[in-house]
Amino acid sequence: MSPGVEALLEQARSGLQRLTPHETVAAVRGGALLIDTRTERHRREQGDLPGAIVIDRTVLEWRLDPASPWRIPEATGYDREIVVVCRHGYSSSLAAASLQTLGLRRATDMIGGVQGWISAGLPLSEHPADVRP
């Protein structure tokens, strides 16, 4: 019997060093990849994050695994810092835990998601999103 989604989320987060929106900005300045898994509709409603690479959740592991033939060029090694974001910071925790299971030990997510970013008063991008198929 499944322990439920809340237990799954708690387990996923227990292995993450989650970042605040301001810590995320600092991590990206230091070279971390900022990965946005939101849908096009949600990005249209909330706006895009500066410097984020948009990757659909259904192909996230394939695009970020350095050993995958379908990886993005920025997926340069298992030691690369990756910060995953979603709308509110729930599915991003599950995604980051999956990336850690894959061997990307520095994968994490941002507390509060894009809504947390907006609440923190951080700027949204003025440029089109960097969407990776």
Describe the role of every protein-language-model region.
Residues 1-33, 40-81, 90-133:
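Rhodanese-like catalytic fold shared by cysteine-dependent sulfurtransferases
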Residues 85:
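Short, surface-exposed ligand- or partner-binding patches at beta-edge/loop junctions that are enriched
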